[in-house]
Amino acid sequence: MGNYIRLSLETHLFFARIMKEHALFLTAGFQCKEKAWIRRADMFYKQFESLHRDVVMVSDKRVGKEILDSCELITEHTIPAERRTQQLSGVQIDSRITMRQQALSAGGDNCEDRNMMPVVTRINQRALQLLDGLISFKENLLQEMSEARVYNANYPLLIKHIIREAKLYRQLVCELIDNQDISKKDLQETENFWNQIMMEHALFIRGLLDPSEVELIDNADCYAVEYRELLEAAREQDCKAGKMREESLGTTLRFSGFKEAGTEGILECKIASIIMPLLADHVLREANHYIRLLQSAENEEECMMETSCSCEDHCKNHCDNHCEKPKENACNCRR
């Protein structure tokens, strides 16, 4: 039960913020004459902001330290980026939610509160309903843009990108509702998903920088190439899983540093671009989320290896002490 509560709240703390920001970026990207589209995008923004607010209000001492320390939920730049983006876009952003989130404390291993079960279940069901609407809205927008029926300042690839992220969120919520857990997916599948997301971030950054920012454009292009090579190696199975994870982690740690420097530069007006400050912080948080996933998988693998070695040593000692003729490979222990 505690795991269900913790995983649900952690999932929404990250993804509900991401979804409300998607709606904000779409709202800001429409022409003034597209009043109906703006109203619908703003409606989704307000609905996900309300969901996010409600999740934050019940998350104190019910989520893990790992996610609070990962800088995937908020960074030191989030509030300044929200305030600057509100000034630039005219979209009202409730930064009090971010302030409350900053004050959250960990306690994910001690959340056996039966009263929270129905609360969390309602949150999951509410998120699922909102996601169905938001995904449909994004897909309709992409179709209309492809037929030149509506203009939005965001790339069509960015619309596809945020549809995939919304569908991942929906998939995770469905798993929580159906199984009260999140299934352990093939790590390669997770890496491929997020390497694709990171590659597209690099492409978006490259395309939104001012042409005068030659060095930053070159750096962004290099990251796009690195992630493309990782995806190609995965498709061709040219790399062992452990080595692939190591390369993905190393690249993403560097890319996170690049994004953080970019966020600071945009907030300080030192970088010429048309990148919204909150978009810069948004893609930084997604990189930090991916880093946590990779590091968690690495830590789990190390624990499994240690447990396996300990088990084999125990069995070998047992056989040496109690068997007349110890046999090679006699260990039948399972983790």
Residue spans of the language-model regions?
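Surface-exposed peri-terminal alpha-helical interaction modules
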Residues: 1-335
